[in-house]
Amino acid sequence: MMKFGLLTAILDGWTYEEAVDIAAEMGFRCLEVACWPAGKAERRYAGVSHIDCARVLEDDDYARHVVDYAAGKGLTISSLAFYPNTMDPDLEKRTAAIDHLKTLIRASEKLGVGMVTTFIGRDQHKTREENYQLFDEIWPPIIHLAEECGVKVAIENCPMLFGADQWPGGQNLMCTPDIFRELFRRLPSPSFGLNFDPSHYVWQQMDYVKTVYEFKDKLFHVHFKDIKLYPEKLAECGVLAYPLDYMAPVIPGHGDVNWPA
């Protein structure tokens, strides 16, 4: 049965315990817990860390507290969340992202969570085909580790293309059904799937319902979000404009995703 939860990245500045408390008070049943490494955030909702995954691996008492505190409030942890660019053209940033993602996978096993939610990443200045080659180099060891740990890795389908900073290709390759098929073909694994967010289909003008049926066995986790497309703005700037020029993220029910479908 699907549980309705909360991504704790919106609670920047709150402790893990405070995030659990507020989620429980609001009636949520699970948490996707933000687990970025310590440091300055490079974008909104990034850089938040409610669980120290390196400490989880080293400190059994801390790991037990993380699980027990949530359980004591009637919550489970649906996933450990970290959304970096593992294919960043900056090799130092790329290596750091990959290393920390592997730490999350190991911590997810130890905590009994069994899920990590993240991005594939993308070198925004390279073609799709060149990024496929990067994927072949970077991702098999990550997924093989997940298999060994009994952890599922769920990739969110956000293109990470909003404005000039991500232009022209965006910073997350895995964002359309044809790319899903190609990457699942290149790396077939029961540990490799989707954290599906239909809102990103709205401004790309794709059929999210069809994707649910086609990739039903790969839907490990779902984001409940919405986007409003503004046709009058799109008619002025066209699809090659920055996406935020013709769409906006909104509260679910106020956008174009037909959630009851």
Which stretches of residues belong to each language-model region?
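Alpha-helix boundary/capping detector
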Residues: E32, S49, A96-A97, Q133-F135, ...
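Glycine-rich, proline-tolerant flexible connector loops at the mouths of alpha/beta enzymes
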Residues: E32-V66, K126
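A short, structure-level motif marking secondary-structure boundaries and short turns
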Residues: K3-L6, H50-D52, D88-D90, K126-R128, ...
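Short glycine-enriched, charge-decorated loop/helix-capping segments at active-site entrances
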Residues: V48-V56, R94, G169-G170, A248-I251
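Short histidine/acidic/glycine/proline-rich micro-motifs that form metal-
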Residues: I10-L11, P37, D52-A54, Y83-D88, ...
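Active-site acidic/histidine proton-transfer and metal-coordination neighborhood
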Residues: E18, R64-S79, N85-G193, W203, ...
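Histidine-acidic metal/acid-base catalytic patches
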Residues: M1-C30, C35-G39, D61-R64, A71, ...
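N-terminal small/glycine-rich loop or linker at the start of catalytic domains
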Residues: M1-L7, E42, I77-D88, R122, ...
